[in-house]
């Protein structure tokens, strides 16, 4: 069976993105819909645009790095921000492609928890 990984990425039921140095280099349609932004708007942007504040972006980045170093993956529930400014609870899980440099490159999944955690 041939697997079309690009199609699977694009049609996944959760938001997916690939990152380099905490910037979005690829994302699927579900991520765009979740955050209310187009792919063109998100590609090349720092993850900071998805956080409620720059401080929260920095705080979580510092908290994740040692965990990604040790385990290679990270997950939590956190408040994120849509393009229209609305904040919402989101389950985020990701994997560093290089544990020695955890923010260098990664794959991340985002699940909107609004229905469970308004």
Language-model-detected regions and their locations in the chain:
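Sensory modules in modular signal-transduction proteins
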Residues: 1-20, 25, 29
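PAS-associated C-terminal cap
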Residues: 1-4, 111-118
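Sensory beta-sandwich core in regulatory modules of signaling proteins
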Residues: 80, 108-109
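Short loop/turn elements at sensory-signaling interfaces that couple input to output
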Residues: 19, 92-107
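PAS-family sensory domains
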Residues: 25-27, 33, 51
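PAS-family sensory/regulatory domains
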Residues: 41-54
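Terminal output helix/cap of sensory domains in signal transduction proteins
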Residues: 54-86
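PAS/PAS-like sensory domain cap-loop motif
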Residues: 31-43
């Amino acid at each position: 069976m041939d697997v079309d990984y690009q199609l699977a990425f694009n049609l996944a039921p959760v938001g997916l993105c690939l990152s380099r140095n905490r910037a979005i280099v690829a994302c699927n349609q579900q991520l765009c819909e979740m955050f209310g932004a187009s792919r063109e708007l998100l590609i090349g942007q720092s993850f900071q645009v998805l956080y409620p504040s720059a401080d929260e972006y920095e705080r979580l980045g510092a908290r994740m790095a040692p965990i990604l170093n040790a385990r290679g993956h990270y997950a939590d529930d956190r408040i994120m921000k849509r393009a229209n400014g609305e904040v919402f609870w989101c389950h985020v899980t990701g994997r560093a492609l290089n544990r020695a440099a955890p923010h260098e490159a990664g794959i991340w999944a985002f699940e909107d928890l609004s229905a469970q955690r308004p």
